[in-house]
Amino acid sequence: MKLLFICSRNIWRSRTAEDLFKRRNGYDVRSAGTAASARIKVNQKLLIWADVIFVMEREHKKRLQEKFPLDIKSKEVIVLNIPDKYQYMDEKLVELLNDSVLPLLDKMNEDSE
């Protein structure tokens, strides 16, 4: 399953998520940001590539809907509601990501069996 994690600048939250979940078997994971200053900017190619898109805040989903409406039309875009107040691999950020993403991945894996 191909997972794409998106935050604003692709420095702290989405990079943490990418590095955390790419360690798990069965997942191909990438990350990007919506801001012009993002380390890796979200683009059409990444959105088409992804099976599931996780965004950190509602604003990120809104930006995707405005800029890439056709590319995400048939995609599952999940808002994690993780605020921009954590640094890379912050213990609390890792805990929030595990608590919010793992149950969703487990459910998706059950549904695909």
Model segments located where?
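Conserved active-site segments centered on acidic
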Residues: 1-52, 62, 99-113
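Short, flexible active-site-adjacent loop segments at beta-strand->alpha-helix junctions, enriched
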Residues: 9, 59-60, 83-86
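Cofactor-cradling patches in redox/metallo enzymes
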Residues: 59-68
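Phosphate-binding/catalytic loops
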Residues: 67-113
